[in-house]
Amino acid sequence: MSTAIAQQKIRIRLKAFDRRMLDLSCDKIIETADNTAATAIGPIPLPTKRKIYCVLRSPHVDKDSREHFETRTHRRIIDIYNPSAKTIDALMKLDLPSGVDIEVKL
């Protein structure tokens, strides 16, 4: 009969349009977790979402002339195992760029 020890885990999902800003945010989170003696796994890259918008170039006629625009949403996951109260406080005080969307699950 084996007993598994339940580990606490924080899962952080990050989304951004700019890949460089996303990677810098991931580095800050991992550095904070390492400084507080928690184990950080990641960043794990998830598939990039591409959204393409098609717009008519002319304001009146000429439907054959169109222009395409796209937005790319880059995503990452970071798992932090065995977080202490110090780890959670440090993550809450972390200053990250406004262009990065963060979801935290405990």
UniProtKB/Swiss-Prot annotation:
The keyword Ribonucleoprotein applies. SMART domains: Ribosomal_S10. One of its GO terms (molecular function) is structural constituent of ribosome. InterPro entries: Ribosomal_uS10 (IPR001848), Ribosomal_uS10_dom (IPR027486), Ribosomal_uS10_dom_sf (IPR036838). GO terms for cellular component: ribonucleoprotein complex; ribosome. Part of the 30S ribosomal subunit. Involved in the binding of tRNA to the ribosomes. Belongs to the universal ribosomal protein uS10 family. This is Small ribosomal subunit protein uS10.
